[in-house]
UniProtKB/Swiss-Prot annotation:
It is a peripheral membrane protein. Residues 1-27 form the signal peptide. Coiled coil: none annotated. It is found in: Cytoplasmic vesicle, Secretory vesicle, Acrosome; Cell membrane; Membrane raft; Secreted. This is GLIPR1-like protein 1. It comes from Mus musculus. Expressed in testis (at protein level). Little or no expression in other tissues tested. Part of a oolemmal binding multimeric complex (IZUMO1 complex) composed at least of IZUMO1 and GLIPR1L1; the complex assemblage is influenced by the maturation status of the male germ cell. Interacts with IZUMO1. Disruption phenotype: Mutants have normal number of pups per litter, body weight, testis weight and daily sperm production. Mutant sperm have a significantly reduced ability to undergo the progesterone-induced acrosome reaction compared to wild type. SMART domains: SCP (SM00198). One of its GO terms (molecular function) is molecular adaptor activity. Its main location: cytoplasm. Required for optimal fertilization at the stage of sperm-oocyte fusion, plays a role in optimizing acrosome function, the translocation of IZUMO1 during the acrosome reaction and the fertilization process. Component of epididymosomes, one type of membranous microvesicules which mediate the transfer of lipids and proteins to spermatozoa plasma membrane during epididymal maturation. Also component of the CD9-positive microvesicules found in the cauda region.
Length: 236
């Protein structure tokens, strides 16, 4: 009886040790999926969007600076979880996606889950080679580019989800939602002119129009997460 108990204990110990090492053994095969509250993820998408918006050619007189919007990010996250390589049908109707938002713009990218936000947005922006500003036409698909540089857009929220069997392979589905939406027929993405020359009551910050006293709330949210982490650590 004593021998049997000892063997059972040893088997339990062996199984525990194996289980405890599994994450270390296989963790590298499971890439981390950034969350919509991750400050690095947020800043990466924001910074590359704004960097490219201030570099448009011809220059833009009325290009707004983009700010992160958590409601748009939640909408993007919910849609990426569907793992469908298609646009969210709700963006076709006014106030359909979110109660207080009119039409919402959307860009989609399918690639590796490890793809960096900068590479995603640059991929969209590279469609600029197909866009003729003078005639406001596209020789090939360029709607992703025109949404990225749509001057009147001021809010953005992005997300990514791991889709294990999308189009026959495992992939990362990236979605960015924009408000106000761009790509209205008959309108150019921005007004040509000297940078910030049409900012109106807004201030000019590094070639982009920025509202007075505008704050970026996502850093505050990230701070709350850090404080909560310190509290939990102190309780352990």
């Amino acid at each position: 009886m004593a021998l049997k108990k000892k063997l059972n204990f040893l088997w339990t110990l062996v199984l525990y040790l194996i289980a405890s090492r599994l994450p270390k053994a296989f963790g590298k095969d499971l890439p981390r999926v950034p969350t919509i509250t991750d400050p690095k993820f947020i800043d990466a998408f924001l910074n590359i969007h704004n960097e490219l918006r201030r570099k448009v050619q011809p220059p833009a007189a009325d290009m707004n600076q983009l700010f992160w919007d958590q409601q748009l990010a939640k909408l993007a996250k919910a849609w990426t979880r569907e793992c469908k390589l298609a646009h969210n049908p709700c963006i076709k109707q006014r106030y359909e996606c979110l109660e207080d938002y009119d039409f919402i713009g959307e860009n989609i990218y399918l690639g590796r889950i490890e793809t960096q936000p900068e590479d995603v947005v640059i991929n969209w922006y590279n469609e600029s080679k197909y866009f003729n500003f003078d005639f406001n036409t596209c020789s090939e698909m360029c709607g992703h580019y025109t949404q990225v540089v749509w001057a009147k857009t001021v809010k953005i929220g992005c997300a990514v989800s791991n889709c294990p069997n999308l189009k026959g392979f495992s992939a990362g589905l990236f979605v960015c939602n924009y408000s106000p939406a761009g790509n209205f027929i008959g309108f150019r993405p921005y007004t040509r002119g000297d940078s910030c020359s049409m900012c109106g009551q807004k201030t000019c910050e590094n070639s982009l129009c920025r509202p007075m006293n505008r704050k970026t709330p996502h850093h505050k949210a990230a701070c709350h997460v850090l404080v909560l982490g310190f509290i939990l650590q102190s309780l352990l």
